[in-house]
Amino acid sequence: MIYRKWSLLSGPPVILGGAVIAAVAVGFVLQNVTKGEQKKNVSTNK
């Protein structure tokens, strides 16, 4: 009974938390990639 309550309370938050963390990580990586490309373009244009 305790395990079932624990799993019901922790299941959805863990899944949602993982999805949020993954989305933030993807956004962070994409920002770094685009910033890196912009820096390369600026340095090659000079």
UniProtKB/Swiss-Prot annotation:
Mainly resides where?
mitochondrion
One GO CC term, this protein: respiratory chain complex II (succinate dehydrogenase)
Q: Which GO terms describe its biological process?
A: tricarboxylic acid cycle
Q: Which domain of life is it from?
A: Eukaryota
Q: Which UniProt keywords apply?
A: Membrane, Mitochondrion, Mitochondrion inner membrane, Tricarboxylic acid cycle
Pathway in which this enzyme or protein is active: Carbohydrate metabolism; tricarboxylic acid cycle
**Location(s) in or outside the cell:** Mitochondrion inner membrane
Transmembrane feature ranges: none
Q: How does it sit in the membrane?
A: Peripheral membrane protein
Assembly, in brief, is: Component of complex II composed of eight subunits in plants: four classical SDH subunits SDH1, SDH2, SDH3 and SDH4 (a flavoprotein (FP), an iron-sulfur protein (IP), and a cytochrome b composed of a large and a small subunit.), as well as four subunits unknown in mitochondria from bacteria and heterotrophic eukaryotes.
Protein name as catalogued: Succinate dehydrogenase subunit 8, mitochondrial
Species for this entry: Arabidopsis thaliana (Mouse-ear cress)
